[in-house]
Structure formats: structure tokens, C-alpha cells
């Protein structure tokens, strides 16, 4: 697909690996943009080619959150001031998505604040994947194309050819996601009920459903410390599961998460490449699948004003 000057693709500092893949599928060059860093930690962005009258697509996941979000905001602002026809933020991983509501008094709703900041900067459209909560789409006053990692996970699961397959949710909050996989594959669903006394620390997990002699695939969206998903895997293995593996959209994997995964009962943990693996500790059980083709096809459909709904395997 030749771009001419009708559309241009640029990327932030930490998402170049994915943007290059997307451009390969679109058969277009990656745009030339410069990020200048100053001694005090401040930075500025500038486009090194004309973007006047072009549909501009900015590929940038917001992880690590603060710098990458600020870089994206500056990219959007610069594109608007350079007379781009439209500015489309392609955000495979949307940071702050776990702050989607007031779950206790006197807290902010970070996801809504970030949505407001992007809108104020001048974004015309957001393309993202597997938001932590679907309702975040409603925080924006511009169109949001919400993609699903099932496009890459479903073929992978089917390629494993597992008998006695069971899909599992690591907590009640993830039951809708896991249920969609179970329904599509026509297999049973298992739920985990967890108690957590403080953030990132899981005290106890109880299994709701039968995993005896089953091959279990746990479905999640974000794996941060990996405490929940590893404990769920261990509990299921103790309950007689034949094998336990996990799929998750976003590979945050903070702190000792790699050690926790490698020491757990999980056979493997499979992510998309919405964000790069940044932990200095290697993880032998980790695998990443590319979402570049899915995002490239979505960009193509946006440019051509074609329907995007066929991009959804399951929701």
C-alpha cells in the first residue's frame, strides 16, 4: 500500500520496533521524527518532513507511562500545529487503564484524565487494544477503535491442539474476557476468586470449576508482578490440572515477575508485543506474538473508510 502523502506513520522512542513492522505490512516508510532531550530531563519533538494535509498515524504505547505519554502528547500537538489533516493515536497499550473508576474515596480517575489530555492535545482518533475496562472508550470525545488480542491468540491456542481444554479467568473481573474465549472455542470456563489485602499482593485463590485432568489456558489483559496469574497456575496444578499456561495482552512484567513465572507451575506465558519486554531479568517461559499485521490492517481500513468490525475475532 503506497502512502504518497495521503497518510504518514510516525512513532515514539520506545515503539519503533512495532511501528517498523506496521510500515512493512503497509508498504510505506516510517516517517522521520526527531526527539531532542535536554539536560534537565525535558524533551521536544519535531517532524523532519512535511505532514501538511496528511492523515498522520502516531504509534506509541504508554509504557513506561509518564515519559511515553508526554512524548505522545507533544507528537499530537506538533502534528496539529503542522497542519496535518487528521491525527490518529495508535496506542497498543493504554497506560493508566487500571484507574478507570473511583474504587475508594479521594482518588483520581487516571484513565479519564489521560483521555482528556489526549483530546486537549488535538487527537482525532484513538486506535488501541484490550483496554483494562471497555468503558474507557466512553472517556474520549473522539472515535475509539478498540481492537482485541484474540486476533493473534486464538490461532495460537488452536495450533496447540490441546485436548480437554479449559479457559480460565484469574479473577472475577476477567471473567467476561475468558468467557468470550470459552464460548468461541466451545469449551468450559473456570473462574478464580481471589482475596487481596493490598495492591500487587494476592493472599488466597479459590477455583470455581473443574480442572482435574484438564489443559488450562488462563486469559488476562495485563501481567504486572505476575503474582495473581502464577498463584492461579499453582492452585490449578495442585487441583489436578494436566497443564496450565497463560495468555495476556500486555507484557508489563515488573520487578521479580520473570523469576516468579519461571518458578511457577505455568508451562508458558504468551504476550503480544504491544510493549517490549523491558525487564533486565530473563524469563525462559515467556513468548511474544506480533500484533503488527492487525494494527496495519486497521490503519489501512481507517484510511479507506472501511469497516473495522471484521478485525474482531471475539470481544
What residue spans do the PLM features occupy?
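PRPP-associated nucleotide enzymes
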Residues: 1-315
Amino acid at each position: 500500500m503506497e502512502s504518497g502523502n495521503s497518510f504518514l506513520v510516525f512513532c515514539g522512542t520506545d515503539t519503533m520496533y512495532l511501528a517498523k513492522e506496521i510500515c512493512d505490512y503497509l508498504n510505506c516508510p516510517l516517517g522521520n521524527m526527531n526527539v531532542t532531550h535536554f539536560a534537565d530531563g525535558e524533551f521536544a519533538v519535531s517532524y523532519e518532513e512535511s505532514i501538511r494535509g496528511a492523515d498522520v498515524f502516531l504509534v506509541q504505547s504508554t509504557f513506561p507511562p509518564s515519559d511515553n505519554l508526554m512524548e505522545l502528547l507533544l507528537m499530537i500537538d506538533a502534528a496539529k500545529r503542522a497542519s496535518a489533516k487528521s491525527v490518529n493515536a495508535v496506542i497498543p497499550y493504554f497506560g493508566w487503564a487500571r484507574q478507570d473508576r473511583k474504587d475508594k474515596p479521594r482518588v483520581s480517575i487516571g484513565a479519564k484524565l489521560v483521555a482528556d489530555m489526549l483530546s486537549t492535545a488535538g487527537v482525532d482518533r484513538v486506535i488501541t487494544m484490550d483496554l483494562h475496562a471497555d468503558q474507557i472508550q466512553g472517556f474520549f470525545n473522539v472515535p475509539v477503535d478498540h481492537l482485541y488480542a484474540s486476533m493473534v491468540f486464538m490461532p495460537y491456542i488452536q495450533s496447540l491442539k490441546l485436548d480437554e481444554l479449559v479457559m480460565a479467568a484469574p479473577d472475577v473481573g476477567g471473567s467476561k474476557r475468558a468467557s468470550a474465549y470459552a464460548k468461541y472455542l466451545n469449551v468450559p470456563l473456570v473462574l478464580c476468586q481471589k482475596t487481596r489485602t493490598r495492591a500487587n499482593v494476592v493472599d488466597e485463590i479459590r477455583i470455581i470449576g473443574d480442572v482435574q485432568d484438564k489443559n488450562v489456558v488462563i486469559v488476562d489483559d495485563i501481567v504486572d508482578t505476575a503474582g495473581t496469574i502464577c498463584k492461579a497456575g499453582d492452585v490449578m496444578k495442585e487441583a489436578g490440572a494436566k497443564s496450565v499456561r497463560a495468555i495476556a495482552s500486555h507484557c508489563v512484567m515488573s520487578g521479580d515477575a520473570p523469576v516468579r513465572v519461571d518458578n511457577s507451575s505455568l508451562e508458558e506465558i504468551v504476550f503480544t508485543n504491544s510493549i517490549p519486554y523491558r525487564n533486565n531479568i530473563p524469563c525462559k517461559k515467556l513468548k511474544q506474538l506480533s500484533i503488527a499485521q492487525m494494527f496495519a490492517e486497521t490503519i489501512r481500513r481507517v484510511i479507506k473508510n472501511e469497516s473495522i468490525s471484521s478485525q474482531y475475532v471475539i470481544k
